[in-house]
């Protein structure tokens, strides 16, 4: 019936919406109670109790237009219809619920009637049971004491039977090797036999049991001494012997001695593996040394590359796995068994006073520390064999596994120093790894410079900056055979190789601080390892090494430049300058971001490293200028010292050495221009190549070399020359060089011309010797002025050379300027 009267619109969401609207209308909350709201006194509030329809209608007529009134009427009609529909729906629903509730109440009445009948029946049965129980208790009241006595006698007889059968039972257990059952049976009867030992029958049983238990104890001791017993059997033996009142201290020593023999076997296996690995390494090393046709030393060569791991029979991860799975696991099992037997075992009253747990705990600590020290020494020996730094992940994973497995000992044996000692081994391994990486980077840098030197030692760099192909990875691949690398290419390759190798090293070292590594959350790896280890010990040390090793090329070279190619000095100076401008900041920023370096401890600032790199670059560039200047000076000195300037013939050509000087200077200009910017020059005159020689024929030199040359003329010319020097600008020959091409060439030319000047001052010239010097100086002036920052510098030095030659000339008759120009143009 209820289903027939249910309206078709029975959607739960629709019903909830209707209920909420009605509750809102009647002012009810969710629990169906009227909400306590302040009554509205507004007669225009249609929902208020004081609503006055007349006032409300008058207000609407005043405030609203006809259209608004009609709309308001339509809205109210819709609301009334909606509420009417909702009310009908609720009436239908409540009617159905009322009918359903009536049916439910009718069913409950029928059920309760049946339940009352069953309860009456149960009450009658309980009364009958109570009456029957009272009747039985009354009947047995007189025989209760007799039954209790008979039960006690029966129990005593069973105990006596157990005592009389005990020797046979113990012998049977001894034959079946059921030692635990025998000990348990004897412990149950021991107190009774001891109490009634004065009775002959019990005394005999006690003696027989004592003999049998002595045999059992002897077998347990023998089983305890045998090395083939498992850990479970060993623990059972110890527990049974303790129950047989064996001395606890002696049992501790025997247990640890037996366990030590097994652990010693594990350590000997690890040590044998170390020896096999050492033999394998020695054999592999001898093969490498004697291998024929090995490639030249280069970073890409597998023979000398420090980033390749040496061949070994077993890698370190397998070694650590074996140590953890065998030694550490067995040690943890021994600790757990020992603690369960001697330390955590409940002590009986007579044993509690002997402080067995304290004694056993002390012996256990000594035992664990001794064996762990031997194990740690083997682990450190194996870590030290990891000389190659090619694959750092194996070492980090091995150290992580080593550290992780040692944490089990800290849980089993609180207060043990073994876990902290293991952490110290990991820390030392990380420090040693950083040193190895630093050494490998240094070796790689030296090998890279060897490649550069080989590339420079092949057919020398032409004026275009190209050279023949050299060996090693820096020279390039197959394309390098057709197009030898230029200085910029060598610089770029060297810089990229160093930077990429350093990034690779940082990525390898970063494995020590990975989130999945257990020891990475230790304070050392969060602080000191990142700041002092990686940043200072690796990155900063490597940058300082680059600067220091570069400066050594200046210190080791002699006055003639040693064996270091000048192009290498120039390239290294540019490399250090690039480090000062950008590379150092980039590397340190990368390191700080990658390792989250916390600058709690003093670290080297970027500015200090940049200053050191700039100092190295300045020193290298100064030395390059000095070396190149001395090379040209050597040619000029030999050309002056090996010539007879008094008896020479009349000059017809420019000397070949002057042409060589100009050619070498031009080559140096191109070479320096490949790596450094042009620089700033002073404004040049349009006739610089000629104006210099006009200085030679100036009024001062006309006074010097006039045909009316008299003995007093040298005094006048000397005076004028000295006065001219007083007012001329001082020239510093070995002044610091700026990082540009013009400054470098200026320094080289100053050294060369100054040497030329000093050599001229030491020689004596004839007439044609002076004229040859004039021709040579004019030729130099025609070409050298364009290389320097200030052409007046060249004018002054060449003027000094000609003037010194005139002072040292026996017959100072200068050549006509036009003749000099013709000879130089023809030359």
Curated annotation (Swiss-Prot):
One of its GO terms (biological process) is lipid digestion. It holds the Pfam family VPS51_Exo84_N. Ubiquitously expressed in adult. Disruption phenotype: Larvae are morphologically indistinguishable from wild-type sibling larvae, but their absorption of lipids is severely impaired. Keywords: Coiled coil, Endosome, Golgi apparatus, Lipid transport, Protein transport, Transport. Residues 99-131, 254-278 form a coiled coil. This is Vacuolar protein sorting-associated protein 51 homolog. The keyword Transferase does not apply. Residues 291-304 have a biased composition (Low complexity). It comes from Danio rerio (Zebrafish). It is found in: Golgi apparatus, trans-Golgi network; Recycling endosome. Residues 279-290 have a biased composition (Polar residues).
């Amino acid at each position: 019936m209820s289903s027939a009267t249910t309206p078709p619109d029975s959607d739960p969401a629709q019903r909830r919406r209707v209920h909420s609207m009605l509750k809102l209308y009647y002012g009810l909350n969710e629990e169906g109670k009227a909400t306590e709201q302040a009554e509205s006194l507004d007669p225009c509030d249609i929902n208020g109790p004081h609503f006055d329809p007349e006032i409300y209608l008058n207000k609407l007529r005043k405030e609203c237009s006809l259209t608004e009134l009609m709309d308001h009427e339509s809205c109210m009609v819709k609301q009334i219809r909606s509420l009417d529909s909702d009310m009908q729906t609720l009436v239908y629903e409540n009617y159905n619920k009322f009918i359903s509730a009536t049916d439910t109440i009718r069913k409950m009445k029928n059920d309760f009637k049946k339940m009352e009948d069953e309860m009456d029946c149960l009450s009658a049965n309980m009364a009958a049971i109570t009456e029957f129980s009272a009747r039985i208790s009354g009947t047995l009241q007189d025989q209760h004491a007799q039954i209790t006595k008979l039960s006690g006698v029966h129990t005593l007889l069973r105990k006596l039977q157990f005592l009389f059968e005990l020797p046979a039972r113990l012998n049977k257990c001894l034959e079946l090797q059921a030692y635990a059952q025998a000990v348990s049976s004897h412990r149950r009867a021991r107190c009774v036999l001891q109490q009634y030992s004065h009775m002959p029958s019990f005394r005999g049983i006690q003696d027989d049991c004592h003999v049998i238990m002595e045999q059992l104890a002897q077998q347990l001791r023998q089983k305890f001494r045998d090395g083939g017993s498992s850990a479970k059997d060993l623990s059972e033996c110890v527990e049974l012997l303790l129950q047989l009142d064996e001395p606890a201290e002696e049992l501790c020593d025997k247990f640890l001695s037996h366990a030590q023999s097994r652990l010693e076997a594990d350590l000997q296996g690890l040590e044998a593996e170390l020896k096999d690995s050492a033999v394998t390494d020695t054999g592999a090393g001898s093969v490498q040394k004697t291998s024929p046709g090995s490639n030249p030393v280069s970073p890409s060569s597998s023979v000398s590359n420090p980033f390749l791991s040496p061949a070994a029979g077993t890698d370190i991860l397998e070694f650590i796995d074996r140590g953890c799975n065998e030694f550490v696991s067995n040690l943890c099992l021994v600790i757990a068994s020992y603690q369960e037997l001697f330390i955590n075992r409940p002590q009986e009253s007579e044993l509690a006073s002997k402080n067995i747990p304290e004694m056993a705990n002390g012996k256990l600590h000594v035992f664990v520390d001794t064996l762990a020290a031997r194990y740690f020494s083997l682990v450190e020996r194996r870590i030290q064999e990891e000389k190659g730094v090619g694959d750092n992940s194996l070492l980090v994973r091995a150290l992580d596994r080593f550290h992780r497995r040692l944490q089990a000992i800290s849980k089993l044996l609180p207060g043990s120093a073994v876990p902290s000692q293991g952490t110290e081994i990991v820390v030392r391994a990380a420090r040693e790894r950083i040193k190895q990486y630093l050494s490998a980077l240094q070796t790689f840098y030296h090998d890279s410079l060897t490649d550069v030197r080989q590339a420079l030692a092949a057919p020398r760099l032409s004026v275009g900056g190209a050279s023949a192909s050299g060996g090693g990875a820096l020279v390039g691949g197959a394309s390098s055979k057709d197009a030898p690398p230029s200085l910029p290419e060598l610089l770029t390759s060297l810089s990229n190789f160093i930077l990429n190798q350093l990034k690779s090293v940082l990525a390898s070292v970063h494995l020590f601080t990975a989130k999945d590594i257990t020891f990475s959350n230790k304070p050392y790896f969060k602080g000191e390892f990142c700041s002092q280890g990686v940043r200072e010990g690796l990155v900063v040390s490597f940058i300082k090494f680059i600067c220091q090793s570069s400066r050594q090329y200046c210190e080791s070279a002699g006055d003639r430049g040693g064996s270091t190619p000048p192009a290498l000095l120039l390239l290294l100076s540019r490399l250090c300058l690039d480090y000062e401008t950008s590379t150092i900041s980039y590397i340190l920023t990368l390191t700080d971001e990658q390792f989250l370096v916390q600058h709690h401890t003093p670290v080297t600032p970027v500015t200090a490293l940049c200053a050191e790199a700039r100092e190295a670059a300045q020193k290298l560039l100064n030395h390059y200028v000095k070396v190149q200047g001395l090379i040209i000076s050597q040619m000029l000195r030999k050309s002056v010292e090996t010539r007879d300037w008094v008896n020479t013939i009349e000059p017809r050509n420019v000397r070949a050495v002057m042409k060589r000087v100009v050619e070498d200077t031009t080559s140096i200009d191109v070479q320096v221009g490949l790596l450094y910017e042009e620089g700033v020059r002073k404004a040049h005159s349009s006739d610089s190549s000629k104006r210099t020689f006009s200085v030679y024929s100036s009024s001062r030199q006309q006074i010097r070399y006039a045909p009316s040359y008299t003995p007093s003329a040298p005094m006048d010319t000397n005076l004028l020359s000295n006065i001219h020097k007083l007012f001329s600008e001082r020239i510093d020959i070995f002044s610091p060089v700026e990082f540009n091409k013009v400054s470098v060439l200026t320094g080289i030319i100053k050294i060369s011309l100054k040497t030329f000047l000093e050599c001229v001052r030491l020689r004596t010239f004839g007439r044609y010797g002076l004229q040859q010097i004039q021709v040579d100086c004019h030729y130099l002036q025609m070409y050298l002025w364009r290389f320097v920052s200030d052409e007046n510098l060249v004018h002054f030095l060449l003027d000094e050379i000609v003037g010194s030659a005139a002072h040292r000339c026996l017959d100072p008759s200068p050549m006509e300027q036009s003749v000099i120009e013709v000879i130089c143009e023809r030359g």
